[in-house]
Amino acid sequence: MKNYAAWLSKKTGKHYRMLSEAEREYGARAGSAGPFPFPFDEGKEYSIAKHANTYGASDGYNFTSPVGSFPPNAFGVYDMHGNVYEWVADCWHDHYNGAPSDGSAWMEEKCELVQIRGNDWGEPPIFSRSGNRNNAAPSDRGDWIGFRVAREL
């Protein structure tokens, strides 16, 4: 993923990088304080299907959906919930004790596991909450994991 950001930076002459875990969550929350930045009918998990690609075809997709298939969030960002987990720049940590307070990525010399945020099309909708986090091996590949880059202005 970092190689892609470096390639894109070289190709365009603009600086691209992977998001930190904190940046990814900030973008997913889009100014909201609750677990979801969109209406969620408790007990009716599939109300999320109007806002994100999650488990089952109630959202119109059996697997991944095309980018922009659901409305953007309050920040104007698309697809922050569901579809695929997003690999972020941070190494996996199972807690926040010692995490950078400036929003930068929490790195180690060598990441045995990487941090992934969001959720994928094969998981129950409850995992679409803005704070959902998980881990993956750096070698993991599949139709359930992707990444997002940021362009520095």
Regions found by a protein language model. Name each.
Residues 1-134, 138-143:
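Functional-site microenvironments in short loops/helix caps that host divalent-cation chemistry
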Residues 143-153:
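Short, structured beta-strand segments at or near domain termini in extracellular proteins/domains
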